[in-house]
Amino acid sequence: MIRKMSKNVVVIGTQWGDEGKGKIVDWLAESVQGVVRFQGGHNAGHTLWINGKKTILRLIPSGIMHDGVTCFIGNGVVLSPEALLREIEELEAAGLDVRSRLQVSEICTLILPYHVAVDKAREARKGEGKIGTTGRGIGPAYEDKVARRALRVQDLFNPALFDEKLAEVLDYHNFVLTQYLGAEPVSANEVRDQAMALAPALAPMVRDVSSNLFALQQEGKNLLFEGAQGALLDVDHGTYPFVTSSNCVAGAASAGAGVGPQALQYVLGITKAYTTRVGSGPFPTELVDEIGARLATIGKEFGSVTGRPRRCGWLDGAALKRSVRLNGISGLCITKLDVLDGLETIQLGVGYRVNGEFRDVLPYGAHAVAQAQAVLEELPGWTESTVGITEYSKLPVNARRYLERVAEVCGVPIDLVSTGPDRNKTIVLRHPFKG
């Protein structure tokens, strides 16, 4: 039973990822004692700007930038030991204390070289039909987890068990690689040697994360649960099959960190003022004209990990409504509002025409979404700059009207507005921890 009152917040992307979660988690980390990653892998990067300096985090929670905040990688994350240790070294080179403040769940599924080999070979074989994976082994690792053949972090410290499980799983993957995908097999000895070489560096950080999070709650400590990607990429609720391999809705925080659902009191939905998507998949409000190119250029829309250009379009309020319902969102944070500065008019997606009928929420499945024609509502733009504004009343009138219409369409209030990449360029209408 929890002895003291703590407040725990889940931060979720409401679109197809790249909404600006990293900056907001970094800003909110000032109010917490722990930050938790609960799903995904090193396929998605969070970009932070601290005093004008760019930092990209792929696995380690954004709270690592704050002294006194403990960071946790929960069991729902698929973990590449090599990628994690490389990221730690990069942060240490920048002067950050990482290892004493990072805990890794002992039951995280491992990403190993054969997962990467399978991922890349599959995409190469699909050609034009590819989904757009980052090729980092995320999907194949989750497949092993669900098929109950995965190696986990705790197996690194039991070499005999590691060898036994590796032989079984590699027999399967090498058959797929050679007989179906036409690729080269992966050497068991090379996988084992690499894993065993990395294990000692990982060992001091391996913990029972679920129990430690429970202990922090008993002490009344505030926790922040940091989602990766976005709700429309969720393996169940996204535009399937053009999705990621994990559940990235707010409910996944409970299972992916090992905490009870009653521990999650507030869900903050991060929403870009327009919409972007990386890779393949339907995108009803996509702009393939000069306005789309303008959004991409001004918004610097390139993936932080892959460098891939992002497709851009108007904010899809009906897709946002789906995310609001899926996640039980308490309030929204609108990011990159300044990218819309200078547009004479702005369009907002309020629904779709599907087979001649109006629908006010995103349909399920890629085929249905591809058939949906966006219904757009035109709003007046603004000429004034919104960059760096920290008071809502000082926003241009039409910018405020745009935000109010977004809130009306999706049915939840806007609690935060980001007006620039630095953490202090934020308008606070209701603080998730203090409001």
Swiss-Prot record:
Binding site for GTP: 17-23, 45-47, 310, 336-338, 418-420
CDD domains per the UniProt record, alphabetical: AdSS (cd03108)
Cofactor note text: Binds 1 Mg(2+) ion per subunit.
Leader sequence segment: none
UniProt-annotated binding residues for Mg(2+): D18, G45
Record pathway: Purine metabolism; AMP biosynthesis via de novo pathway; AMP from IMP: step 1/2
GO cellular-component term (any): cytoplasm
Gene Ontology molecular function terms on file: adenylosuccinate synthase activity; GTP binding; magnesium ion binding
Domain of life according to the entry: Bacteria
InterPro entries: Adenylosuccin_syn_GTP-bd, Adenylosuccin_syn_Lys_AS, Adenylosuccinate_synth_dom1, Adenylosuccinate_synth_dom2, Adenylosuccinate_synth_dom3, Adenylosuccinate_synthetase, P-loop_NTPase
Keywords of this entry: Cytoplasm, GTP-binding, Ligase, Magnesium, Metal-binding, Nucleotide-binding, Purine biosynthesis
Catalysed transformations (reactions): IMP + L-aspartate + GTP = N(6)-(1,2-dicarboxyethyl)-AMP + GDP + phosphate + 2 H(+)
Locations listed in the record: Cytoplasm
Known role: Plays an important role in the de novo pathway of purine nucleotide biosynthesis. Catalyzes the first committed step in the biosynthesis of AMP from IMP.
Protein name as it appears in the record: Adenylosuccinate synthetase
Organism (species): Bordetella pertussis (strain Tohama I / ATCC BAA-589 / NCTC 13251)
Taxon lineage: Bacteria, Pseudomonadati, Pseudomonadota, Betaproteobacteria, Burkholderiales
